[in-house]
């Protein structure tokens, strides 16, 4: 995603270059569809909350369908698109999610680029702190393998969780349907009277308030791209709205939708 933002190359070309440099697997499916990030956030959740690895009710979305147009739009709006894995403990219930987000371009996470990874930890009374380092390439991979191998040879059988399973807790998981997010929505539509009215009616019916709306014409004057930034709304209502809008006859391409995070 960083490379797409820097070069304006398409996803396919950037992926092929990443393979050649050793930053992506020869079969990068798990990196692209979010499975690799899903496994990582499950392990980190277990470590952070002293719980068993919880595989249920986790939202997972990959990066394979991100278009250059949305990366460009994000820049114009003051955002960057980042693939985040997030775990939160709310009222003793675990929420885990993996998906692309729009992040303020001036934020710390908004400036984690290239092969750098970052982990943000927030709690009481420690507040918030960040760990940053390279997450791909020969050096980081070799270092991790050698470290784990040496620990095993030294007889450290508690890896990777440090404490026995019997001392871990079971924490109930909930999905993100009841969580609230601001969002970016892009709709490619037939440019005709009544389209904007139909879009806003659908959003209003699902209790979604429009914060900002931009209409960009296509080269062909018959079509236009509608960009909507919403106020915070329930995730289930956002998803329902996208589904309903996708079925409108005036929508010519699959709608694009990104949650907006303030981290």
Regions from the language model: what does each represent?
Residues 17, 22-26, 86-88, 94-190, ...:
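Catalytic, metal-anchored helix/loop core of enzyme active sites in primary metabolism
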Residues 149-263:
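A conserved regulatory-domain signal marking ACT and ACT-like small-molecule sensing domains
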Residues 15, 19, 66, 71-81, ...:
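Short secondary-structure transition/capping segments
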Residues 28, 32, 37, 49, ...:
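General "foldedness" signal
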Residues 6-7, 29-37, 59-66, 130-133, ...:
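Catalytic cores of large soluble enzymes that bind and process phosphate-bearing ligands
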Residues 3-5, 9-111, 116-118:
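Substrate-binding/catalytic subdomain of NAD(P)-dependent oxidoreductase enzymes
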């Amino acid at each position: 995603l960083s490379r797409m933002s820097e070069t304006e190359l398409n996803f396919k070309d950037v992926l092929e270059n990443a393979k050649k440099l050793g930053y992506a697997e020869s079969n990068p499916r798990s990196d692209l569809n979010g499975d690799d990030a899903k496994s990582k956030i499950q392990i980190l959740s277990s470590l952070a909350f002293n719980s068993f690895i919880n595989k249920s009710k986790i939202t997972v979305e990959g990066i394979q369908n991100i278009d250059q147009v949305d990366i460009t739009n994000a820049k114009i709006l003051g955002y960057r698109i980042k693939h985040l894995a997030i775990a939160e403990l709310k009222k003793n219930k675990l929420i885990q999610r993996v998906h692309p987000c729009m992040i303020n371009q001036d934020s710390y996470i908004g400036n984690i680029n290239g092969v750098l990874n970052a982990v943000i930890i927030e709690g009481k009374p420690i507040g918030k702190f960040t760990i940053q380092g390279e997450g791909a390439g020969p050096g980081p991979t070799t270092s991790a393998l050698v470290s784990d191998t040496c620990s095993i040879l030294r007889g450290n059988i508690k890896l990777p969780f440090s404490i026995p399973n019997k001392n871990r807790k079971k924490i109930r998981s909930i999905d993100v349907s009841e969580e609230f997010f601001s969002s970016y929505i892009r709709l490619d539509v037939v440019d005709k009277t009544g389209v904007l009215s139909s879009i806003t009616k659908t959003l209003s019916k699902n209790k979604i308030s429009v914060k900002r709306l931009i209409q960009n014409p296509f080269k062909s004057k018959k079509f236009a791209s509608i960009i909507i930034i919403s106020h915070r709304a329930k995730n289930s209502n956002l998803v329902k709205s996208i589904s309903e809008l996708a079925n409108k006859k005036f929508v010519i391409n699959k709608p694009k939708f990104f949650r907006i995070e303030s981290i």
